[in-house]
């Protein structure tokens, strides 16, 4: 079967290698036990109020553009009142009105072991006694670097930065420096941060707000950015032919999470590796989202494909600001001060981020981690799609390990153009309904969802039951 998002209540299966087939076929069967809710649905609806969030958000709009510090948080694409979060723990969040939510955003991916993990908090408290920022090398950088290098197949050396955007900026500059070529290929709907060169047919908040690009990006900054539809190897071949000898790299999300959840077809992901090798072009996996989430070694371990360079973020900081890029030693040795490609950062290698990352990765390395994520995410995704089928809503969706997504569309969804066929107005109604039920999904049809080790079977069952109620009334 092809690696697509399938409709009518069927979750994603992969067959691009025997390893992946075995992994999917051996996934634990879903356990549809009946869970008694401690608070009735009517009581929950009656008590649901966002008055304090509304007041605080109205004040915020006079202080910050749109009232937020990242656009998708403003709920513009889903409507309704943005919630202001007061605290988090495990799989739950509480807003300033006291409402509790089962959280499937996980701070947009980092909270894979659960929010405010006790061991991570204790380790951070110990590190903070020594200081919050050194602006100098520390042993914690060595520890996390060794963990990343031992885990991620493509990484022989790594450079820590402060965000996924920084990581992608650095890796593109490095690819251009190493190849002495300036053009690169990205895919429509893939998001690699908000640096000028990447804001062309981008996903994430750009897609959420329905923007083609962004004002303020000079044409010169994107003149060497080439784009192709995701999962379209022929389009890449045509770009290679049209710009022979001019392309430095191809960068992609190995599983798209910023146009919704879109996996690669086996033909595409394998063909892309061979095509870049044949043409002397560097292959870059942007694993800011998929790194340490699909498997301990990320998407490249999961698919059995080793890129030349990789970007990381989110999980490797355990919820603190972080990013990283790494790859082959001969390429990475071009980075200053070892080489001439300059990149620097005041807070890079921050001891708090290193500490949180170390303890998060230690937890993820424990036996059974990814089997558990696969089990609960399979049950969640299948349950939501089955609820859509029961209530007569065309839906499609899929999952890999602790990452999932669904669209209000027949499907299949192979690329950004397909994802935009989704009924975003219906998704908005679904999102708002689930919020009232105490379930927090990403406030955009064009963002993937995440499970964590803190999510319980009860969380999953309550979410599925809530989804069926909401879908029956929208």
From Swiss-Prot:
PROSITE patterns: AA_TRANSFER_CLASS_3 (PS00600)
Domain of life according to the entry: Eukaryota
Cofactor(s), by name: pyridoxal 5'-phosphate
Organism: Arabidopsis thaliana
Classification via CDD domains: OAT_like
GO cellular component terms, A-Z: apoplast; chloroplast; chloroplast envelope; chloroplast stroma; cytosol; plastid
Subunit structure: Homodimer.
Protein name in the entry: Glutamate-1-semialdehyde 2,1-aminomutase 1, chloroplastic
Gene name, Swiss-Prot/TrEMBL: GSA1
InterPro entries per record: 4pyrrol_synth_GluAld_NH2Trfase, Aminotrans_3, Aminotrans_3_PPA_site, PyrdxlP-dep_Trfase, PyrdxlP-dep_Trfase_major, PyrdxlP-dep_Trfase_small
Annotated compartments: Plastid, Chloroplast
Residues bearing the modification N6-(pyridoxal phosphate)lysine: 314
Catalytic activity: (S)-4-amino-5-oxopentanoate = 5-aminolevulinate
């Amino acid at each position: 079967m092809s690696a697509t998002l399938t409709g009518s209540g069927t979750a994603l299966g992969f067959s691009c290698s025997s390893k992946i087939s075995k992994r999917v076929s051996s996934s634990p069967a879903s356990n549809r036990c009946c869970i008694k809710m401690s608070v009735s649905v009517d009581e929950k609806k009656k008590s649901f109020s966002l008055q304090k969030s509304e007041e605080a958000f109205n004040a915020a709009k006079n202080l910050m553009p749109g009232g937020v510090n990242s656009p998708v948080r403003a709920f513009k694409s889903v409507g309704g009142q943005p919630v202001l979060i007061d605290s988090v723990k495990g799989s739950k969040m509480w807003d300033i009105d006291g409402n509790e939510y089962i959280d499937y955003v996980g701070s947009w991916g980092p909270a894979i072991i659960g929010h405010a993990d006790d061991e991570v908090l204790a380790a951070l408290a110990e590190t903070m006694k020594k200081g919050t920022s050194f602006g100098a090398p520390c042993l914690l950088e060595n520890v996390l670097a060794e963990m990343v290098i031992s885990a991620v197949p493509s990484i022989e050396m790594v450079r820590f930065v402060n965000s996924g955007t920084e990581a992608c900026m650095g890796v593109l500059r490095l690819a251009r420096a190493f190849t002495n070529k300036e053009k690169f290929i990205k895919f429509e709907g893939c998001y690699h941060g908000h640096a000028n060169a990447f804001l062309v047919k981008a996903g994430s908040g750009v897609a959420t707000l329905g923007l083609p690009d962004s004002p303020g990006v000079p044409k010169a900054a994107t003149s060497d950015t080439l784009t192709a539809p995701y999962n379209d190897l022929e389009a890449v071949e045509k770009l290679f032919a049209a710009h022979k000898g001019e392309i430095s790299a191809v960068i992609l999300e190995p599983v798209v999470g910023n146009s919704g959840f879109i996996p690669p077809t086996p033909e595409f992901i394998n063909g892309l590796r061979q095509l870049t090798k044949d043409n002397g072009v560097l292959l870059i996996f942007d694993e800011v989202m998929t790194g340490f989430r699909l498997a301990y070694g990320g998407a490249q371990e999961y698919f059995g494909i080793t890129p030349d360079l990789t970007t990381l973020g989110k999980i490797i900081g355990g919820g603190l600001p972080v990013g990283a890029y790494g790859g082959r030693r001969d390429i990475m040795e071009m980075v200053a001060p070892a080489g001439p490609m300059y990149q620097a950062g005041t807070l890079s290698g921050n001891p708090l981020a290193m500490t949180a990352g170390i303890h998060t990765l230690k937890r993820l390395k424990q036996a059974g981690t990814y089997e558990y994520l696969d089990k609960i995410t399979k049950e969640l995704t299948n349950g939501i799609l089955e609820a859509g089928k029961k209530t007569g809503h065309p839906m499609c969706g899929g999952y890999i390990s602790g990452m999932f997504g669904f669209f209000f569309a027949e499907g299949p969804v192979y690329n950004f153009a397909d994802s935009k066929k989704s009924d975003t107005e219906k998704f908005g109604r679904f999102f708002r309904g689930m919020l009232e039920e105490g379930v927090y999904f990403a406030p955009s049809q064009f963002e993937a969802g995440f499970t964590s080790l803190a999510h319980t079977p009860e969380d999953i069952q309550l979410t599925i039951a809530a989804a069926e109620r909401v879908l029956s009334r929208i």
